[in-house]
């Protein structure tokens, strides 16, 4: 008999709507003992079967659902099916957009909670972010090896959220060769170098692919400021769009060095690209005080909010930095601003930009809205999957 998680009376509604999380407050009791990440059955207070998921006693998310089908076992065949389903959509996208790199598995939205897999050429980069994902590591890797024999697998499960699930951080090769120090990938006509072993996340922000392309329509013969530039994806796209100058700002000299290499790799005019190592908040104030002006500003900061207790502080941070950007824009200039914080809704982010414009003493028009690229889908029953949002704003 399997271990069962019994829900408190009336707490089954979200599961009936196929939401994949069960929070600790919804649990009445456990029937049997389960180890960290082990597969359990989830039942309502009367014992009616609802779902099968992974148990995580150390997390506020007490269980994550693998399947709502009572006949489905969680084994190698299960992961093979899920991977094949996800691959169909990525194959279409890759062919349509000329990609050799994309997000293969987007966690809950691909029916594999706590699992992220990015493909960069013939390297699969794996992040196991939940206890259940870690528990099923061997089955998942076996399925990957069968479906992708040409690919090496590299683990980047060096993410702090694992500690909340009672797990250590892990990183290193799983199968095949080590990735090179910098791996070239292709994106909308650009060649970009990715540091799989030491870069942010899995090495590169694939979720901003379509936003980088959209930037090109605004930049011809314009002076562009690229804030939190990382390895220069927006800068390369701006140069391909015909900008007169792009200034990339980041605190990491290593990232700026790769950004410079990316400009050279694409045979673009390096004299139009400037790379500044500095704190963005500080530099924006310096630019304002000395009267610098730009035609287009890209504002793509790291996540400002990790939990609800940080939300108010994050709102202030987003408002301040966007206010400074708006002050630096010429009349008719365009601000492309983003938030990758899952707790920041699109409506709240839009209000923050409006408040920033008021504080800057400028009017803005919202002219375009952005979200994560199409290889980062959001399943309808899990709206939390929509974490990246952005706006193009015309400053009057």
Curated annotation (Swiss-Prot):
Q: Which InterPro entries match?
A: PUA (IPR002478), PUA-like_sf (IPR015947), PUA_sf (IPR036974), RLMI (IPR023542), RlmI-like_PUA (IPR041532), SAM-dep_methyl-trfase (IPR019614), SAM-dependent_MTases_sf (IPR029063)
Report whether Flavoprotein shows up as a keyword of the record.
no
Residue ranges of domain PUA in the record: 2-81
| Gene3D superfamilies listed in its UniProt record | PUA domain, RNA methyltransferase domain (HRMD) like, Vaccinia Virus protein VP39
- Main localization is cytoplasm
Write down the Pfam families for this protein, in alphabetical order: Methyltrans_SAM, PUA_3
What is a single cellular component term in the Gene Ontology annotation? cytoplasm
Keywords attached to this Swiss-Prot or TrEMBL record, sorted alphabetically, are:
Cytoplasm, Methyltransferase, RNA-binding, rRNA processing, S-adenosyl-L-methionine, Transferase
Q: Any S-S bridges, and between which cysteines?
A: none
Q: Which PROSITE patterns match?
A: PUA
Q: Which reaction does it catalyse?
A: cytidine(1962) in 23S rRNA + S-adenosyl-L-methionine = 5-methylcytidine(1962) in 23S rRNA + S-adenosyl-L-homocysteine + H(+)
List localization entries: Cytoplasm
- What's the top EC group for this one? transferase
Q: What EC number(s) has UniProt assigned to this enzyme?
A: 2.1.1.191
Alphabetical list of PANTHER family matching this protein: RIBOSOMAL RNA LARGE SUBUNIT METHYLTRANSFERASE, S-ADENOSYLMETHIONINE-DEPENDENT METHYLTRANSFERASE DOMAIN-CONTAINING PROTEIN
**HAMAP family in the record, alphabetically?**
23SrRNA_methyltr_I
What function does this protein fulfil?
Specifically methylates the cytosine at position 1962 (m5C1962) of 23S rRNA.
Q: What family name appears in the similarity comment?
A: Belongs to the methyltransferase superfamily. RlmI family.
NCBIfam families in the record? PRK15128.1
Q: Identify this protein by name.
A: Ribosomal RNA large subunit methyltransferase I
